[in-house]
Amino acid sequence: MTFHKTFGYGCIVLICFELLFAGVETSSENDDEYLTQKEIILEKSYHGLIRENETLVEITPLIKVNEEKICNFHILKKPYHEIPFKIELVNNLGILKARRTLNCENRKSYHFEICAIYCDGTPSNTANVHITVIDVNEYAPTFLEPSYVIEVDEGRLYNEILRVEASDKDCTPLFGDVCKYEILNNDEPFSIDNEGSIKNTEPLSHKASHNHILSVVAYDCAMKESAPIMVSIKVRRVCETKFVGMPERIDYTSGSTESLQLFPNARLDLCDISCKNEEDLRIHSSIALKTKHISFGCDRDISNCTSGQKVKDLLPHGAEWTKELSYDEGLEPIFHFDGSTGVVVPATVIDHYDFSSQPFSILTLFRHNSQVEINKHVKEHIVCSADDHKMNRHHMALFVRNCRLIFLLRKNFNEGDLNIFSPAEWRWKIPEVCDNEWHHYVLNVEDSSKVDLFIDGVRFENSIENRHSNPEVIDDWPLHAAHGVNTSLAIGACYQSLENRLKHGFNGDISEVKVSLNSVLTAEDIKCGTTCAEHLLAPKPLQSNNEKSYSDNSQIKENIEMNEIYISAKNKHDIEQFMRKVQYINTKQKPTVGRRNIEVLTTLNCKNESSLRLPPIETYIMVNEPIAPLGIDIDVVSASLETSDLTPPSYSPKIAISGTSNKLVSYQEIKLGVHILEKTCIDSVSKNNGKLEEKNHIDSCSVVVFPSLNPDHEDIKIDGDESLSSSMDIKTNINKDGVEMIGKDTISNYINVLRSLVYSNKKPAYYLNRVFKLSCAQQSSQYKSGEYTLTLTVLHPKQTLFKSTNVLPSSLSKVNFIGNTDNETSFHRNSGSVNGNDNNQPTESKVYSYSLLHTNNVQEPKSHIHSFIHKAEGSHVTMLIILVSVFLAVLLCGVSIARLKNNQKYIEHHQPCPKISDDGLIWDDSALTITINPMQADVTSDASSESENSESEDEEALKDGFTHINQLEWDNSNIFQQ
């Protein structure tokens, strides 16, 4: 029994345990399911961005929860780490905010964990949060130094003068790195790169500026600009060994001085340069005058060259056979040849001269236009003597072919010499022919065995290695006999008689071609023609009592052309004295105006040491126009040279322009046209060998109008036949600025054209006067006269009274003119405007002149009428009563005056007028009484209208003489007419 009880209790306990374990197991499964639902509330990680100046964090992805289950969030803090954030639950979203504004420069990112809190207080699973602080460009770059100061040497180019550096406190490369530097004042010769390195772009000069102050800024990569800082770059003066006191420009005026010192204030600054032994110092200087661009390489004056030989000019300027050539007018005429032009010299100059039998010389000055592609077979003749008909044989010629100067001389037929070879062609291979420069060539031909060539005054000498080939001499047979065939001499080409045309033309410019017949030019003649009139004068060594002669320690040399001087001295004092005495001179009477460059080179050397080359000095001489005296007459220099002989220089001629300086014209005259220069005279006289000689030719004249013409109503034309100047050698060009006349012709022809110029103006009221300036020139426009000025004054008519229908009697008009004859004649004599060829002009001019001399103080009726109307309108009614009361008295007076007036008119028309003196024209209104009927309104309006009409017809009234005098007589008869 006891066993059964015990067993029963054991079963009950066992069952209870089973039930207990079963309940525990069920509860554990429910708890795991609940926890699993909590873990999916948050993501494993979140990433956030926050700007420095904001507090809201942008979270990706969004923290989404269910507010029915989640009531809060919690940030899990770690020890020793500050988490400046908070999280709030708003509308099922977790909003993460910063407790304060963050600073990227202090900390760029934050890492922490968050969890959601269920409403029952149970926490959810945790999630990692990574927040990055976004930088804001809140800081500008700042330089490490507040300013920079540095000193540099002048005259140097530095790769880097100094380096400036700036930094930025922002934390990201975009805002925190400096990407650019800039110099704000761009006018300074400096540059800066992106690394802050400053260098100069040109050598600095202490004289120009001893301190350069730069304003420099820096930019970060977002181009935020820093505050500027000052960079001071001081220029340290460096002593440079060189000549100082050398002028940049030297003015030279012909006729002012015979010679001109170039460097009167020259001083050599040696700085600290010295030799161990002072006697070992040597200073070398060279002064070069560069005139290649002037005229033919320099100014040449052959006016003083004298020669016993008869020189024929085959290319004279102004000759009949050279008129068709294209040329430049100037001191030395230059003829242009293009390969298709040339001229034949008339037989009257050289009559079929046999060049093979007599000695002769050819002198020429030309510039050959060499081409890139040279045809080796093309001949370009300077001078050529060939058959005049039947054949094309060349007897004598000077031509260029394949950059060689070739001279041809064929012997004529002589019995016994037909089969004998003799030199016939000389070929010089010289660079001067094809260098496009001017060169002077002289050929002296004494016989067929001796031909000498001179280039720029220097005799051509062949070198040893090519003495047999330069010149290359070609032998040939004499020409065959040809009866009745003469020669034609051509310049710039060669005459081909079978084709009857010029051929083998020259390409280039030729200034002169001359020949000396029966004799050759001497060395003195050649040198005189090629010597430059302008050159440098070397200083002369001087001897003092206390010092050694300069020649002991110094050397002075100059070249043959006298355009270079070499000076060598042993000390600073000597070289300075020599440089100060170097002079320039130009002996040509009329030097070429322009610039001549001067170059000075200096070197220093000590014995057994390397030499030091000083900076070259570039300056120039400016040759100016000769100084001319003021006034109309001007002295000019004669630079003409006779074509047949070398004549001595002549004295300067004078061009004198004379005439009236003022001309008065009326409206009617200027509308029809006036001869502006009808009283002009031109004279040109020169003094030669103490005798006065008249120069009958001038080259150009110009008439300048001031102000310029208005083509709408002004005009200048040639009176009568517009082709007047075309029959002469004068070309006339008329434009709004005046008249230009060009062409060499006689003075009388120029005067005829000038006097025929007619100026007209359809609207003369626009101008009070006109100014015409006349100037003329001689000798290819080299010498100009002074300006002759003529002032043309327009006489404006005086405002006339209202027009009257009465005409002035002719007898009264005649008396007025006769009475004023003396005054008018003297007035016109002074003004110089009398024209004896026009009988109507003096009469008309007197009327205008008289109105200018005698001004009458008479008010116009229009003003009187307005004045009276104003008073009448302002009168009281009582004025009408007073006027009516006196009406009878006025009526009686009016009738009496009317009868007297009619009687006076009858007497004036039937009796001669007495002579009217000048004072009679002065209006005396002391006894005049004017009464106007205020009721006669229409009379007033008619008079006013008539006065206005008279203003528009003032010119017609003036034409009628003194017709306005009758208007001064008061006629009150119409007052009583109703």
Swiss-Prot record:
Q: Indicate the secretion signal residues.
A: 1-26
Q: Which Pfam families match?
A: CLSTN_C (PF19699)
Matches recorded under Gene3D superfamilies? 2.60.120.200, Cadherins
How this chain sits in the membrane, per its record, is: Single-pass type I membrane protein
Q: What is one cellular component GO term in this UniProt entry?
A: plasma membrane
Domain of life, source organism: Eukaryota
The Acidic residues compositionally biased stretches are 948-957
Q: Membrane side Cytoplasmic: which residues? A: 898-978
**Keyword set includes Calcium:** yes
InterPro entries attached to this UniProt entry: Cadherin-like_dom, Cadherin-like_sf, CLSTN_C, ConA-like_dom_sf
Q: What is known of its domains?
A: The cytoplasmic domain binds synaptic Ca(2+).
Q: Could you tell me what this protein is called?
A: Calsyntenin-1
- Organism name: Drosophila melanogaster
Q: What is the lineage of its organism?
A: Eukaryota, Metazoa, Ecdysozoa, Arthropoda, Hexapoda
